[in-house]
Curated annotation (Swiss-Prot):
GO BP term, pick one: methylation
NCBIfam families: NleE_fam_methyl
Listed GO MF terms: protein-cysteine methyltransferase activity; toxin activity
Name by which UniProt lists this protein: Cysteine S-methyltransferase OspZ
Organism superkingdom: Bacteria
Protein residues bound to S-adenosyl-L-methionine: A92, S98, R107, Q111, Y204, E208
Compartment list: Secreted; Host cytoplasm; Host nucleus
Pfam families: NleE (PF20798)
Naturally occurring in which organism (per UniProt): Shigella flexneri
Enzyme class, broadest EC rank: transferase
Record-stated family: Belongs to the NleE/OspZ family.
Length: 230
């Protein structure tokens, strides 16, 4: 079972070069051993040092970039509306689109991934008013982290974030049950089961959810047909 961590409601601007503190500030339960490890190739874009605990933040790549991104996010930020309208999947198909649709008030919750806990966008997001993130490591990956970003000023925000995490766990459990199937079949079968509710959580238009499920079912049929002739 995933145990994600939500950042505190108001993360204050960080005026420190301590590379351990800035991560614990947004992800308190990160394992202590994480900081005894050498920065990986993705961390090295933002910090430099023998270990993460002894590393220094890079001025241009982290400090200045986080400041630029935070300023941009503030210009795009909008208070939460009373009602949300469906969005297109295309609006959230890349990480920036995923969090931008949340902070601009288009939807209460989104999800994206980062390749480093020192990613400037993640730290900038955590300083915005009424924005929170739940963070957990992606399974079968040594460096990716799932970020669930949501609105605190919407009752739907954290409810949807928690349900997303439940569905994420359900998909993992389904894939474990189907462990004797091919990786492709496991992925498609588990996706079909959760796709509709997941799409609704992400505020996708119903016709796009229908189209995506049809696409998954068509792929499933093609694979089964291919297997039947081999």
């Amino acid at each position: 079972m995933i145990s994600p961590i939500k950042n505190i409601k108001n993360v204050f601007p960080i005026n420190t070069a301590n590379t351990e503190y800035i991560v614990r500030n947004i992800y308190p339960r990160v394992e202590h051993g994480y900081f005894n490890e050498s920065p990986n190739i993705y961390d090295k874009k933002y910090i430099s040092g023998i270990t993460r605990s002894m590393a220094q933040l890079k001025i241009e790549e982290f400090i200045n970039e986080k400041s630029r991104r935070l300023n941009y996010m503030k210009t795009m930020y909008s208070p939460c509306p009373e009602d949300f309208q469906p969005i297109s999947r295309d609006e959230a198909s890349i990480p920036e689109g995923s969090w931008l649709t949340v902070i601009s008030g288009k939807r209460p919750m989104g999800q994206f991934s980062v390749d480093s806990l020192y990613h400037p966008d993640l730290h900038a997001l955590c300083e915005l008013p009424e924005i929170s993130c739940k963070i957990f490591p992606k399974e079968n990956s040594d460096f990716l982290y799932i970020i669930v970003v949501f609105r605190n000023d919407s009752p739907q925000g954290e409810l949807r974030a928690n349900r997303f995490i439940e569905l994420y766990d359900i998909k993992r459990e389904i894939m474990q049950v189907l462990r004797d199937e091919s990786p492709e079949l496991k992925s498609i079968k588990s996706e079909i089961i959760i796709a509709r509710e997941m799409g609704e959580l992400f505020s996708y238009a119903s016709e796009e959810i229908d189209s995506y499920i049809k696409q998954m079912n068509d792929r499933f049929s093609q694979i089964k047909a291919r297997m039947s002739v081999t």
